[in-house]
C-alpha cells in the first residue's frame, strides 16, 4: 500500500521573497526619463514572411500531410529555371515551411541588419542544422522592407532511437542573429513645428507632472505641458538639426516617481502572490483552515478458482481517497504600515498561498486590505 499526501504550497514567505526585498528601497526614487517614457511616433514595426528551411537531417515536413511545402518548393525551383514535372510526388524530408518574423526598429536604414525568428508551420520534427532561404519580409502595407537568409540557431536539443525519444525545449523554432538586411526605411515623423509628444509607460498624473516640472526647470517654463495622465507636449527648437540634441537632454533628466497605486497581484493557477511596497493592511481577525487530501492505493490480485482452466489472473487497483479539513483558529492581524510589516503579519497566519487567495479577498471585502486586488 502506498500513501501519497497532497500537501499545499509552501508558506507565503517563500512566495513573497521578492516583494519583501522591495521594502528596503527608498520611498521615492529618481529615474531617467528615458526609462519611464517614449517619444510618440518612435517605435518599431512588425515584419512577416513565408519561406523554406533546407538542409535538415530528415526532420523536415512530410509533404503528404503538408502539401504547401511541396508547392512552395516547386514554385521556388521554377524561379531558378528548374521545371518539376506536373504530378511529381517529391518525398523530401530535409525541407520545412516556416514563418519568419522580425521587428524593424525605428530609424532603420538600408543595409542595417536585424534579428529574425523562424518558426515551423508544418509537421517538421526539428529545424536544427537548417538554412533559411532568401525570404522577403513585408510590413502591414504589403511592402517588402527586409530580406532574410541564414543558418537557423535552435536552442533546444533532442534525440530518438528505438521508439523512445527525449527533448529539451522546443526544436520547431529558432533565431538567426542579424539574419535580415533592411532594404527600405520606414518614414518616422515625431516632430512637427517643434512640437514633440512624450508618452509615459504608465498612466499616472503624479509621475507625469513630476516629469513636466523637471523639464520646465531645465529648459524654462512652458517647455512641457501635461496633456493627460500619460502624454506630455514638448516645445522644442524649430530647427530640425537641433532637435536630436534637445531630445537627448530630455531623455537623461532625472524624474521622481510618484507613489505607486497599492496593488496585490494573485495568480490563481500557480498560487503566486506579489504585492508592491505601498500595500498596507488594517487591524483584522482572520480564521482559516487547512485542507489535505490523502490517496491510498492497493493492488488486489484475483486468480481463477478452478485450476488448469482458461481463467486469467487479474490485478485490480483499489483506491481510497480521504479529504481532511482542520478547523482554523481566529487570529489577529495588526495594522501594518509598510511592506515588511504586511509580509510579517501574513506570515504569522501560517497560511499557504492557496489559502491566501481567499484570505486576501475576504480582507479586501472587509476593508482591511488597503490595496487593489488583481487576480490573473
Curated annotation (Swiss-Prot):
Keywords: Bacterial flagellum, Periplasm, Signal
InterPro entries, A to Z: Flag_FlgI
Major subcellular location class: periplasm
Coiled-coil intervals, chain numbering: none
Keyword Signal among record annotations: yes
Cellular component annotations (GO), alphabetically ordered: bacterial-type flagellum basal body, distal rod, P ring; outer membrane-bounded periplasmic space
Cleavable signal peptide: 1-29
Keyword Lipid metabolism: no
Subcellular location: Periplasm; Bacterial flagellum basal body
Entry's Gene Ontology molecular function annotations: structural molecule activity
Biological processes, Gene Ontology terms: bacterial-type flagellum-dependent cell motility
Pfam family, one: FlgI
Membership in a protein family: Belongs to the FlgI family.
Subunit note: The basal body constitutes a major portion of the flagellar organelle and consists of four rings (L,P,S, and M) mounted on a central rod.
HAMAP family in the cross-refs: FlgI
Function: Assembles around the rod to form the L-ring and probably protects the motor/basal body from shearing forces during rotation.
Protein name: Flagellar P-ring protein
Provenance organism: Bordetella avium (strain 197N)
